[in-house]
């Protein structure tokens, strides 16, 4: 499999850093509203890559973040009369349902507020 290298401007043969193991991090959603087609396109695209790598025999660790601390979240929660955590929990559940409907592969998610100092 070849991957486009933006630094060199060339397609390079994919070589994992660790034999037969691939770690993928994909920037996730900022959860202040429903999932839209742009989100779906991103996650379906990476879903295809994860499935391909697994079918090629790689062990894949797939991680996406969820941004649950953001000015847009604070504004939206005030508009709806909810706490920021109530708002983000609502949209995380909705997002997970949408991706379940799309039958995307499971992933590990990191919530931004859990990784802040």
Where are these regions (language model features)?
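Residue patterns forming the tRNA-binding/recognition surfaces of aminoacyl-tRNA synthetases
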Residues: 82-106
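Conserved small/polar residues in nucleotide/adenosyl-binding loops
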Residues: 108-117
């Amino acid at each position: 499999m070849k991957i486009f290298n933006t630094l060199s401007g060339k397609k390079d043969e994919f070589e994992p850093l660790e034999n037969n193991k691939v770690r993928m991090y994909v920037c996730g959603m900022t959860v202040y509203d429903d999932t839209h087609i742009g989100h779906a396109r991103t996650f379906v695209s990476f879903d295809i890559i994860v499935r391909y790598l697994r079918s090629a025999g790689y062990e894949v660790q797939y991680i996406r973040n969820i941004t649950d601390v953001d000015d847009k979240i604070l504004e939206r929660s005030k508009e709806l009369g909810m706490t920021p955590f109530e708002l983000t929990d609502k949209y995380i559940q909705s997002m997970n349902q949408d991706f379940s409907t799309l039958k995307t592969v499971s992933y590990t998610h990191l919530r931004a507020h859990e990784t802040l100092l």
